[in-house]
Each structure stands twice: as structure tokens, then as C-alpha cells.
Amino acid sequence: MQIDAVITWVDGKDEAHLQKMLPFLEDKSQVNNKSFRTRFDQVEEIKFTVQSILKYATFIRNIYIVTDNQVPNFIKNKTQGTFENVFIVDHADIFKEDLGFLPVFNCRPIETKLYNIPNLSEHFLYFNDDMFLLREVKESDFFEEGKPIIRGNWLQFNENIFYKRWFNSEKKKNRAGHKKAQEKSAKLVGFKKYFKFHHTPAPM
């Protein structure tokens, strides 16, 4: 079974990327606040993500870095014979017939297009750029008989938890995010609970 790795990445310090984003922000001053900078700034962590995969997941065939017309510094400066199975994939390559929706700054629509990565294997591991492998892993840690092993736990919807019904602010209740996306997905398929995925590489 061939298995690839896919990493979504953005360099929020890139001035060209920032200029793309500004027209879509209601409050343009938020680009300077701490929470915004924490989410979008990068400190070369993508290099450690890639190196950890190369060192500890030797079964990985290719590594694809999905980004918006950007290239990590370690790839720009690579020497011959290094990172030969690491490839940059632009958003335009995966949005194809939906180019009119670019630029995109939300991970949800990007994730729905990962299947369009050219030459991507049927099975792959999806990483965020802040995920690192710390010891050797095997195919069987992520797939069993070709099916993905999902790590997490089943939880109640917030509205079914007494204290969260009464003490959560309206702003927090309606805030978009990873947890809210999982809750809504579970409801759409008729589940009474939702499965909260841990922040780990996701087999697909």
C-alpha cells in the first residue's frame, strides 16, 4: 500500500499574502493582534514537520506541501539530493474548476480539495504544519486493512451539556472552529454525539 503525506502551510509574514487577505478583513487592525499573529505567522516549523516524517515515517512515498504561491525557505535553499520527494502544491492546482473562489484563507475548503493533488496516493496522512513525529511509526499505526485509524473520543454536543447551555456566551457558541465543524458534521449525518479528533496526523 502506497502512503503519502500532505501538509497544509502558510507563511503569514509574507507581505504578498497579507495584501491578499486584507480586503477580506472587516477590522484590518486585527492583523497586528497576538491571536492573529499566532495563527498565521510561521517560524520555520514546517521544516521540522518534514524532517520528522522523513526520519520516523520511512514508509511515506511523497510529501506534498499545499500552500498559496509560497515556498518554505528550506526548500528554496535545498541542496542537490535533499528533500527529493517533497513537492510544493499550489492552491490553484487543487481548486481547478473553482479558481474563482481563490484566494482562500480557511482550512476547511482547502481540506475538501486535497484529493485533487496531482499523483496523490489513495491513502495518505494529513498533517498540520505544527505536527511533529517524535519516534518511529509504522503503516499499521494509521491504517488497518486499508482503513484509517482515527484517534480521539466521543463527546456530547455543547447544547446537551447543562453548564455549557447556560454559561457559554453567544459569541463563543457561534464561533467557527475545529470543534464546531466536527459537531455540525456529526449532526448532518444524524449522530447524537460527535467524535473529537485529537490534534494528530490524520490518516485518509
For the regions a language model picked out, list residue spans one by one.
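Active-site-proximal specificity loops/subdomain of glycosyltransferases
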Residues: 31-37, 41, 71-120
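A solvent-exposed, charged loop/short amphipathic helix patch at secondary-structure junctions
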Residues: 12-39, 152
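Short, acidic, metal-binding catalytic loop of nucleotide-sugar glycosyltransferases
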Residues: 52-60
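Short catalytic/ligand-binding loop motif for oxyanion handling, primarily in non-cytosolic enzymes
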Residues: 13-17, 71-76, 96-98, 132-136, ...
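Short beta-strand/loop segment that forms part of the nucleotide-sugar
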Residues: 61-70
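Short loop/turn segments at strand-loop or loop-helix junctions that form parts
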Residues: 4-13, 19, 91
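GT-A fold catalytic core of metal-dependent nucleotide-sugar glycosyltransferases
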Residues: 71, 113-157
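Long, charge-rich alpha-helical interaction segments
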Residues: 150-204
